[in-house]
């Protein structure tokens, strides 16, 4: 599995509602100090890959919100 997919899947698994900025900050704080596959994938992302993950995550959250309305 590609690093982007690992990180995006973890974001989708952990954070499905609430404030996106808070979710991203919490994710960063959590995976800065953990030593696991998600941590390694997260820190191997390039800047472009990080943006792609964020774009996909925001798109996912928008779709979930629209489905719940």
Model-predicted segments: where are they?
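Structural boundary micro-motifs
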Residues: 1-69
